[in-house]
């Protein structure tokens, strides 16, 4: 909401739309991108059941989409990025996190407005929070605010089971 009356938020690898719906409920104009048509249909149903509307739904390979958005000169006030370790686009495009994350972050850096925010979740045991921070900083430069760390699940015995990492920044 700090971005203005209707901030533009891009949700990539958006799956069933939890973050999309949270952003929309907060008043953002949201573009939801996922490569699986059935998942986007499910997300749209979730929106309808939540009493919301006005989301831009895109079934596309996320990397191809952001490349086109860069060419179009688009900007977003916020980008939510939740890529899988491995996946396929709608036309069989291959996504491998370790191979594609640098280009994805570079494109996102060009799309993010000057006072925008980025939320990045990575669920790959091969990447630490420090590596994620380094990759984001390489693409975006220094952040005005940043927060990063490990994502984990705590079991009943109090043992922390690792899930991945998060990185949040504001320009």
Feature locations, PLM:
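Conserved class I S-adenosyl-L-methionine
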Residues: 6-15
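Helix-to-beta-strand junctions that scaffold the AdoMet/dcAdoMet cofactor pocket
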Residues: 112-113
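Conserved SAM-binding motif I beta-strand of class I
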Residues: 29-34
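Gly/Ala-rich phosphate-binding loop of Rossmann-like dinucleotide-binding domains
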Residues: 24-25
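C-terminal catalytic and target-recognition region of SAM-dependent MTase-like enzymes
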Residues: 117-171
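S-adenosyl-L-methionine
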Residues: 36-80
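Mobile active-site "lid"/loop adjacent to the S-adenosyl-L-methionine
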Residues: 39, 59, 77-107
């Amino acid at each position: 909401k700090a971005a203005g009356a209707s901030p533009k938020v891009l949700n990539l690898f958006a799956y069933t739309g939890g973050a999309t719906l949270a952003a929309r409920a907060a008043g953002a104009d949201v573009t939801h991108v996922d490569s699986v048509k059935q998942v986007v249909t499910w997300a749209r149903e979730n929106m309808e059941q939540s009493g919301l509307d006005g989301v831009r739904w895109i079934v596309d390979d996320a990397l191809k989409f952001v490349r086109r958005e860069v060419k179009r000169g688009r900007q977003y006030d916020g980008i939510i990025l939740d890529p899988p370790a491995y996946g396929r686009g709608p036309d069989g495009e291959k996504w491998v996190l370790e191979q594609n994350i640098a280009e994805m972050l570079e494109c996102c850096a060009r799309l993010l407005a000057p006072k925008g925010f980025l939320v990045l979740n990575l669920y790959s045991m091969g990447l630490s929070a420090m590596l994620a921070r380094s990759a984001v900083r390489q693409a975006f430069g220094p952040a005005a605010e940043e927060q990063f760390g490990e994502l984990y699940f705590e079991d009943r015995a109090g043992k922390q089971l690792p899930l991945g990492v998060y990185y949040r920044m504001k320009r």
